[in-house]
Amino acid sequence: MRVGAEYQARIPEFDPGATKYTDKDNGGMLVWSPYHSIPDAKLDEYIAIAKEKHGYNVEQALGMLFWHKHNIEKSLADLPNFTPFPDEWTVEDKVLFEQAFSFHGKSFHRIQQMLPDKTIASLVKYYYSWKKTRSRTSLMDRQARKLANRHNQGDSDDDVEETHPMDGNDSDYDPKKEAKKEGNTEQPVQTSKIGLGRREYQSLQHRHHSQRSKCRPPKGMYLTQEDVVAVSCSPNAANTILRQLDMELISLKRQVQNAKQVNSALKQKMEGGIEEFKPPESNQKINARWTTEEQLLAVQGVRKYGKDFQAIADVIGNKTVGQVKNFFVNYRRRFNLEEVLQEWEAEQGTQASNGDASTLGEETKSASNVPSGKSTDEEEEAQTPQAPRTLGPSPPAPSSTPTPTAPIATLNQPPPLLRPTLPAAPALHRQPPPLQQQARFIQPRPTLNQPPPPLIRPANSMPPRLNPRPVLSTVGGQQPPSLIGIQTDSQSSLH
């Protein structure tokens, strides 16, 4: 709905000299306007005199009264001076109007071209009277059906038509009906849209086609002989039955209203209290990757629920039961899950059964045997560094000869690798262990293919030998006497 100043029309100033609106040819004229000072009894008496004595209709009589400014005496005196225009419609006029209306519809200007002696006002007036009283079929169709029935049915139908001469009369004026209206008789008059002739025609059809045109009550309505007898037994029986039905209808409406109130109350309770009982909606998706928070939650779940992997998966939210089992198997050493499980068992007062231990061992074996592209942290921690193996025999035990310990403590290196034994070397040609220990300071990590440099006594001024003796590995811990004497001298010189 458009409301506001912007939707209001702008009215220009009044100009008395402007003659914008002119009289039109077919413009309407006001013929009656009610006046409160005239009583209804006098108005009815005036209309009756105008109709009976002077042949005026109601509209013409009221127009005369309105012309004399609602003065009844002047209107009664002026009624004989005018002859009312006869507004009669013959059968030919009605047929032409129906044809014109079927062609042009409500275009009364075009209908007037086919009926030039009729004004547009009379055409409009007749249209509304014809619209109310016309039947489903037009006048021409009814006449054609009558002729067809006469031709088919023969003399019997002709006799029926002769007994009812009003069948062919289609005029709106009926002297019998007018007499009944003016006499105000209390006899009930059965009126219908199809008229008397149509009713007789229907009765004739019903007589010949009784099964085809049987009337049935509307849908949902049932008639029984007992009800008809009960209604027709007394004049007040129908009112009594209707009153009982009204009481039943009122009680049913009351029940419907009570049911609506109960339903509305239940709906209010549901809207107010159902939110508390709704489970929280989780939109988390299953993810195979474990974050730090999820790992901590899993450890706490083992501490609280033990091996109830379903409960642990529900606590985490985005992990399945199988993923929780794999976590327990793969991370049991890293997070010390065995001790956590033992603490839970101690609290519960139960101990793990042998069946659980066997199943856990099978799971660990299957997890270790299945090749996977990913290595867990537990497997990385399980790998410990191993000492490199020596190609030759194990070195002899260190002798009691005092050696400087500061470099050994600072370097903290493994013993050097020795050269493999020569097959043709004599057993007496061996290298003393102290010299081998000294070579450790000169070259901490000799390679396998590179022999140690020749040993030179620090206090001796003698030149070194041109051909140094090759280093041989000791066999059995025995050394030649000459080397022992040299070693003894070197030890005494060091002291």
From Swiss-Prot:
> Which residues are recorded as modified (Asymmetric dimethylarginine)?
R445, R457
Location of the Glycyl lysine isopeptide (Lys-Gly) (interchain with G-Cter in SUMO2) covalent cross-link? K20, K193, K285
Q: Name one GO biological process term.
A: regulation of transcription by RNA polymerase II
**Which Pfam families would you find in this protein's record?**
ELM2 (PF01448), Myb_DNA-binding (PF00249), REST_helical (PF20878)
Major localisation: nucleus
Q: Give the coiled coil ranges.
A: 237-273
Q: Where is the composition biased (Pro residues)?
A: 393-405
A molecular-function term among this protein's GO annotations: transcription corepressor activity
Biased composition range(s): Polar residues: 348-357, 475-495
Which residues are recorded with the post-translational modification Phosphoserine?
S156, S171
Annotated compartments: Nucleus
The answer on whether this UniProt entry bears the keyword Nucleus reads: yes
Which GO terms of the cellular component aspect does the record hold?
A: cytosol; histone deacetylase complex; nucleoplasm; transcription regulator complex
Record-annotated ELM2 domain positions: 1-83
Give the record's keywords alphabetically: Coiled coil, Isopeptide bond, Methylation, Nucleus, Phosphoprotein, Repeat, Repressor, Transcription, Transcription regulation, Ubl conjugation
* Comp. bias (Basic and acidic residues): 162-184
Which stretches of sequence are listed as region Disordered?
147-219, 346-495
Compositional bias of kind Basic residues: 205-217
- Please give the residue positions where the record annotates the modification Phosphothreonine: T376
| Phosphoprotein as UniProt keyword | yes
- Give me the stretches of Low complexity compositional bias: 419-428
Domain SANT residues, every copy: 84-135, 285-336
Purpose: May act as a component of a corepressor complex that represses transcription.
**Family as reported in the entry's similarity comment:** Belongs to the CoREST family.
Q: What is this protein called?
A: REST corepressor 3
Its source organism is: Homo sapiens
